[in-house]
């Protein structure tokens, strides 16, 4: 693992964002052959098809937001079921959402809600594995640790499909996971499944970035002086050999073939350093996204996609208020969770649109 702190689809003329949403949504429900990896593989092998979507940003709401408090308020249900929030109209006639996501309400013509996604598990751990891999965990209704025989996450599958091309041009990774809870230990002292490559092997893990982009000292890569020293060596493996006592814990890198070359390219690539440098963004734009882990994560996701990364997952930060709201549900939603999500998600859509990238970028919001 590299870790740094019923209508027929159009063919010849390309695939629209809504068609991608429809087909990609089926893959997220676990239907074989219709997921994002298959679509990307088709993009690479079927030259007669020229899909418009070139990248995907996954917004993963850690803790599982309740649909009756967000997108589908169940206005006809009993009060005990529907909660205290009121629906508001969107800019699409007949579509309503919760009152605390007003920005997204005015962008409803830009996204498609899939309200039929469900799963039979009653624990967060295996449910996350299901949502992020498309496959039910072999131990349903439990809280298992991440294991080597888990099914891989979507980013890992994409890395595997592009075997030999795990890094995009200029040393950029193919798949990145931001604010990664995969690096964080749960209350039960284990690491959650669903975020890793599983049985594909650690070399296909996404690039995990656990440091938050809203921190003033955000620096997911080593200082440039350190990278230059690495660049001056003939290979990263030689650097490991010369500092074997200090880097003994990384000896397993040799088992991954060209994996150490990926690490070397990541550390020394100017393009990677530029892509992660959110300080290059204008202060007003950063403020539009919101100075939160999620908001700045969305901004960084846009920068990465703009630079050539194919799949970026922005995980909701679990050390802050997150979506598993068994206590003080309504206050947390209206004071923190929904406003921060509404701000970051809506700005991401508008920013991509302003840059002419929205039709080529699939955004998937789920939890």
Please state what every model-predicted region is.
Residues 1-367:
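Ligand-binding pockets and gating/stacking loops
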């Amino acid at each position: 693992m590299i870790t740094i702190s019923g209508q027929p689809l159009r063919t010849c003329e390309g695939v629209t964002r809504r068609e991608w949403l429809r087909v990609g949504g089926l893959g997220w429900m676990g239907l074989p052959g219709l997921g994002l990896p298959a679509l990307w593989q088709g993009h690479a092998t079927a030259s007669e098809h020229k899909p418009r979507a070139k990248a995907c940003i996954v917004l993963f709401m850690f803790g599982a937001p309740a649909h009756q408090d967000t997108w589908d308020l169940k206005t006809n249900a009993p009060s005990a079921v529907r909660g205290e929030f009121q629906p508001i109209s969107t800019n699409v006639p007949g579509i309503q959402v919760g009152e605390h996501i007003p920005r997204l309400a005015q962008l409803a013509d830009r996204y498609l809600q899939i309200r039929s996604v469900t799963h039979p598990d009653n624990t967060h751990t295996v449910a996350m594995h299901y949502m992020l891999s498309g496959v039910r965990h072999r131990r349903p209704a439990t809280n298992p640790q991440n294991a080597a025989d888990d099914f891989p996450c979507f980013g890992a599958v994409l890395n595997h499909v592009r075997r030999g091309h795990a890094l995009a041009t200029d040393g950029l990774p193919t798949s990145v996971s931001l604010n990664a809870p995969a690096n964080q230990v749960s209350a039960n002292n284990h690491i959650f499944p669903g975020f890793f490559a599983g049985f594909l092997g650690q070399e296909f893990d996404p690039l995990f970035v656990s440091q938050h982009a809203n921190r003033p000292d955000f620096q997911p890569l080593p200082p440039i002086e350190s990278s230059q020293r690495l660049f001056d060596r003939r290979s990263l493996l030689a650097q490991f050999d010369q500092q074997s006592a200090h880097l003994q814990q990384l000896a397993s890198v040799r088992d991954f073939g060209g994996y150490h070359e990926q690490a070397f390219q990541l550390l020394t690539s100017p393009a990677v350093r530029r892509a992660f440098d959110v300080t290059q963004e204008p202060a007003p734009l950063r403020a539009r996204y919101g100075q939160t882990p999620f908001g700045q994560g969305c901004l960084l996701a846009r920068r990465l996609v703009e630079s050539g990364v194919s799949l970026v997952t922005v995980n909701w930060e679990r050390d802050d208020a997150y979506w598993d709201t068994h206590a003080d549900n309504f206050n947390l939603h209206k004071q923190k969770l929904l406003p921060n999500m509404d701000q970051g998600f809506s700005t991401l859509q508008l920013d991509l649109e302003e840059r002419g990238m929205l039709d080529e970028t699939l955004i998937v919001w789920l939890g």
